[in-house]
Structure formats: C-alpha cells, structure tokens
C-alpha cells in the first residue's frame, strides 16, 4: 500500500489541517445522517478486512486472532454500535433550568463539535486506541487527524490504508511517522487533542495545547492496585488477577500492579 500523500514538514501538515478546517466550516459534518453513514461505512470496511486487521496485530504484537478480536476489534465494533444507537439522543438539545432573572425565557444546551481533532494513539492497543476515539470524534461531527504509533508499523499501515479508502481526506487523515511528526502536529492549532501514552509525552502535549488553550484529553495510565476481600473465592480471584496481568503480555494500563 502506497499512501496518496506524503508529509515532509510542519507546513505540509498545516496545509492539510487548513483544508480539513475549511471542510468543517462548510457544515458538511453536521447532519446526523452523514455521521451515521460514516460509521456504517467504517464498520463495513472492518468486516471486509477483518483478517487483515488481525494479521497486523499479530505481526506487531504477536496477538492471536482470538486476543486481537477480544481486546481490540470487538471493542471497536461495540463502540460503533453504541454510537449508532445513541447519537440521535446525544444531538438533541437538553432543556436546563433558567435563572429567575431571565424569566420568561427558557434555556437549552446544544451539543456542537469542536472542529478538527487530533488523535495520538499508542502501540499497546494500536487498533482499539486509534479507532475508538476517532469514532467518538466523528460521531460528534468533528474532522480527525490520526497519528498512530510508529512502533506498531503493520497496524499503522493498515490504519492509513483504512483512512484513505473509507474517508474523504478532508474528514480524516492518517499521519504515521516518527517523533518528528509528533512535533509537527503539536506545533499546529487543533480544536481538540486526544492522547494515550506516557506521562512524559502527556506533559509535552499539555504544554503545547496550552499555547492555544486547546481542550485536551490525556489517558496516561498509572498504578493499578488489586484488592482482594477476605471473603473472596481465592482460586477465582487468583485466576482473574493472573488473567488481568497477562493479557496483552501485561501491556495494559489497568493491569494489576500490586
């Protein structure tokens, strides 16, 4: 697979983001039937290329097809199904109380998308943690720049192919590459940044986002104690602790630490 477009500088990335922002400002992503169509098309593509996706996970991480489906692809399908079932309700205006000083007016909250969002995903769940936040952003009506991890090269190549074959490039772009690509992305003003990874990189992203007061969601892992009550079934508890620690070779943010 050869990408249709290459990015050699921050200026190239900026030009791409500018095109996406112009597309967003046309209002093309606002109709719910448009968003629904995107999710249905993505699901159909994944179903058709399921073996390819699972093989990429095997190539990168040694995951069996069962584990790849259970911990990644199946979760992506669940997210698509959930968003399809809830998106119309989420989009409805929500009536809220109005202060007496504003009588006789009424108040509502209208949900609106941010604009162009950046999703920076990690290598340990390279499919799930790239597609799930992207699906959520698209459901809300955003455009998305996806930056997958350079460590999971096979999955990143699959994601780039998926993005080019499923989406209008003004809606979604996949920008794989080195840490230099991360620097280029962080030098640009996005309307939302979603990052999963280490606290060290998370601090850099928060610092860069502060320059533009960009809204940020950081999932940085942490410590995960496992508490076993005195009246627990010890055998069953031990099995579950071992499963939680060993699944994905222990590379899970909530794997039991102690």
What kind of region is each of these model predictions?
Residues 168-206:
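Active-site phosphate-binding strand-loop segment of PLP-dependent enzymes
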Residues 35, 80, 141, 172, ...:
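Residue-level signal for inorganic ion chemistry
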Residues 98-170, 213:
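Conserved small-residue-rich beta-alpha loop and adjacent elements
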Residues 7-9, 200-258:
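ALDH superfamily catalytic-core signature
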Residues 96-103, 174-177, 240-241:
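Short gly/ser/thr-rich secondary-structure transition/capping motifs
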Residues 142, 147-149, 176, 196-197, ...:
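Short beta->alpha connector loops at strand-helix junctions that form conserved
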Residues 1-108:
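N-terminal Rossmann-like NAD(P)+-binding subdomain of aldehyde/semialdehyde dehydrogenases
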């Amino acid at each position: 697979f050869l990408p249709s477009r290459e990015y050699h500088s921050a200026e190239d990335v900026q030009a791409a983001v500018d095109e996406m922002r112009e597309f967003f400002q046309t209002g093309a992503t606002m109709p719910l039937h448009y968003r629904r169509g995107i999710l249905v098309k993505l699901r159909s593509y994944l179903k058709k290329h399921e073996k390819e996706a699972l093989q990429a996970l095997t190539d990168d991480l040694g995951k069996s097809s069962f584990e790849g489906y259970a911990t990644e692809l199946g979760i992506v399908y669940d997210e698509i199904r959930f968003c399809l079932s809830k998106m119309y309700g989420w989009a409805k205006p929500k009536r809220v109380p109005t202060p007496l000083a504003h009588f006789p007016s009424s108040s509502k909250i209208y949900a609106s998308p941010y604009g162009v969002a950046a999703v920076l995903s990690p290598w340990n769940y390279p499919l799930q943690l790239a597609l799930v936040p992207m699906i959520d952003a698209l459901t809300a009506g955003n455009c998305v720049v996806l930056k997958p991890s350079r460590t999971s090269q096979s999955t990143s190549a699959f994601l780039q192919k998926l993005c080019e074959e499923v989406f209008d490039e003004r809606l979604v772009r996949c920008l794989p590459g080195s840490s230099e690509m991360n620097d280029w992305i962080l030098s640009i003003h996005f309307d939302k940044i979603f990052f999963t990874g280490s606290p060290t990189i998370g601090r850099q992203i928060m610092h860069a986002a502060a320059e533009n007061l960009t809204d940020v969601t950081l999932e940085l892992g942490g410590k995960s104690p496992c508490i076993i009550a005195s009246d627990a079934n010890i055998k069953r508890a031990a099995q579950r602790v071992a499963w939680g620690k060993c699944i994905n070779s222990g590379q899970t943010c909530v794997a039991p630490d102690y």
